[in-house]
Amino acid sequence: MNPAQPTLEQFEALDALVGEWTTFPDVAESTGMIVTRVHSMAEDGTLVAFRDPRDGVRRIPAEFLMDGHPIDALRGTMTVLRDNLYTDLEAVTWLFTEDESLPGRPIDFLRAGRKAEIRRRAQTLDW
């Protein structure tokens, strides 16, 4: 949804946080969707993807998927972060960064179905 793509340095820093990535064809295969539907999900904010500057392939953090489907809380949480003027790069960095006050990473809370606390925090962020 956010057209700005990370530089090599930014992507490598994000890669260190995210760890495991998946691609559009892999998501399509695991969900039984056609790949154009996965592209639509990235366009409408259901998923977030970044172009890897090393090979030009668009990648999605694997933890954005559970049981082969996008986690339900991701789209709304990304909307809150974007409304607070976070870029997708900043938002995903925040989601994958340890927060001792939680404790843990915001993405772990979203995956556990605990979106209210994460969205509350996202609304009050001062990046």
Question: Which sequence ranges carry the predicted segments?
Answer:
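Non-transmembrane "mature" sequence context
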Residues: 1-127
